[in-house]
Amino acid sequence: DHKKIYGLINQQNYKQLALDLADASLIADESIVDTIINGLYMNGTPVADLFDFVVDIAGNIVEDKLKNNKIAHTDAYLSRKIITRSVDGLNRDKPNGNFNGKNALCINFEDNLPDIGVVMSEVLMRHNGYNVFNSGSHAELGELSSIIVKRKINIVLFYLCNLQCCNAVVEDNVSKTVNQIYDSIKVANKLKIDILFGGEGLFLLDDIKGKIDNTFLTYNDLKKLI
């Protein structure tokens, strides 16, 4: 299996690797998951391409299986957790300290998820010279101001996915999420720092469209914004 994976990596066959990554994650084969992600990385695949063409596609494959009732919610959750762990490992190659003098804070809107989108954002920003703090699920807004000042943050990145398990875009929570986004923008404007919003979840929030300047769907988009 590993030999086949290395062959696909050398051919840059992203489509098949995404399928294999989805399958391996669903049977909890961490060895194959790590081989695909680390193998592509070591082979010189740009981080943004690795995320856009392999990791995100694998996530979509798993999500489609969930929508079609081929797998359970728990399967999808475990799949994403395994992939997230492997992706997070890429942060070790760019520890904080190798930076361009700028500090970034990454936040997501979920309390209970291993949010792969925010982890991929952190990896990409570190590989582009940022010193990154990942606070995971949304910090209290009062806290947000003090963290920004204390850590000398230049840019804040919020990530909101639209996966079935994402509670932040469930109807009951939408107004809360929208309020959090508006409040975050106010904090950023007051402190004169850049704010980025990523993920397809934003497109489910009608009130927000057109009111946020810097949004990204792909990691190649994010790369251009930073």
Identify the meaning behind each predicted range.
Residues 137-143:
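Short acidic loop-to-helix transition motifs that present clustered carboxylates
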Residues 134-135, 197:
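A structural preference for short, hydrophobic beta-strand core positions in alpha/beta folds
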Residues 144-208:
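Cofactor-cradling patches in redox/metallo enzymes
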Residues 1-95:
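Long amphipathic alpha-helical segments
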Residues 102-105, 156:
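Conserved hydrophobic helix-helix packing surfaces used for dimerization/oligomerization
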Residues 213-222:
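Short acidic-hydrophobic, aromatic-tinged amphipathic segments that line or gate anion-handling sites
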Residues 119-133:
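Short helix-loop-beta junction
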